[in-house]
Design a protein with these regions (language model features):
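Bacterial N-terminal signal peptides that target proteins for export
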Residues: 2-11
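C-terminal motif of bacterial Sec signal peptides marking the signal peptidase cleavage site
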Residues: 22-23
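Accessory carbohydrate-binding/adhesion or oligomerization-edge regions at the termini
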Residues: 26-110, 192-227
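Short structured motifs
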Residues: 115-118, 129-131, 174-178
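Short beta-strands within extracellular/lumenal beta-sheet-rich domains
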Residues: 124-134
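Non-cytosolic beta-sheet module surface loops
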Residues: 136, 145-149, 194-196
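Aromatic-lined ligand-binding clefts that engage carbohydrates, nucleic acids, or primary amines
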Residues: 141-156, 190
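Beta-strand-rich ligand-recognition modules
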Residues: 157-206
């Protein structure tokens, strides 16, 4: 028997999905990649991470759990799970150079489709790597990474895999939420791999506290950090 609570939950998920799809498809072209920039910005009021280093897309196939895990666990370039790139850094993948770009957005999400399109790169059946640095003035225990993506994605914090969502999906705010973790004092590395099938692709991410409210009080630092 379907309960009112189940109907209410399903309706809420549907509304959020429609909101995410509309936000992705209705706005104009995304901002051009920022090059050679050192950025250290306060969070927006909802706590979304808006400043990222994104690698030009890599061709892959598959959105199921096993296909995504196989794709993200393959080594495309040295130290891909520990590398802290700078804007303009290059890596070699299958004998071709790919470049990291510093990108920022005024929205809650980062549009990966426009990122790739503006660079003249493939937008479908591709893998995006993205990295950002969360700079905490003090240790923050009990935080949870809350993410959304179109389509599948896997996320790491300080080298530990913390959340993954799979299959073809629209971006929904807080679609996947990690277990509680501790953000250490100083620099914390947030890394994600996103696989897109044909169509729009984007991500959103923020940290939530025990009351499901955005964690604030830190900055996002894409500056000249140590490797």
């Amino acid at each position: 028997m379907i309960t009112f609570r189940e109907i209410h939950k399903a309706l809420a998920v549907t509304i959020l999905a429609l909101f995410g799809a509309t936000s992705c498809t209705s706005r104009g072209p995304a901002q051009s990649p920022v090059r050679g920039a050192t950025m250290q910005e306060n969070l927006n009021p909802q706590g979304f991470l808006q400043h990222w280093l994104i690698l030009e897309p890599i061709s892959v196939m598959g959105l199921t759990d096993s296909a995504v895990q196989a794709a993200v666990k393959r080594e495309y370039f040295p130290n891909q799970f520990t590398l802290i790139p700078r804007d303009g850094d290059k890596v070699t993948i299958d004998d071709s150079e790919s470049t990291w770009h510093a990108v920022n957005t005024d929205d809650y999400n980062v549009n990966l489709y426009y990122f790739a399109h503006d660079l003249g790169k493939p937008t479908s059946n591709v893998l995006f790597w993205a990295v950002t640095i969360v700079d905490c003035p003090q240790e923050m225990a009990g935080a949870r990474l809350a993410i959304g993506s179109n389509a599948a994605s896997v996320w790491w914090v300080n080298g530990q895999e913390v959340i993954g969502i799979y299959n073809d999906r629209q971006t929904v705010i807080d679609d996947g939420v990690s277990k509680r973790l501790t953000l250490k004092q100083g620099l914390n590395v947030v890394r994600c791999a996103v696989i897109n099938s044909p169509g729009v692709s984007d991500i959103c991410a923020r940290f939530l506290d025990a009351e499901h409210k955005p964690v604030k009080g830190f900055t996002v630092n894409l500056g000249d950090v140590a490797r």
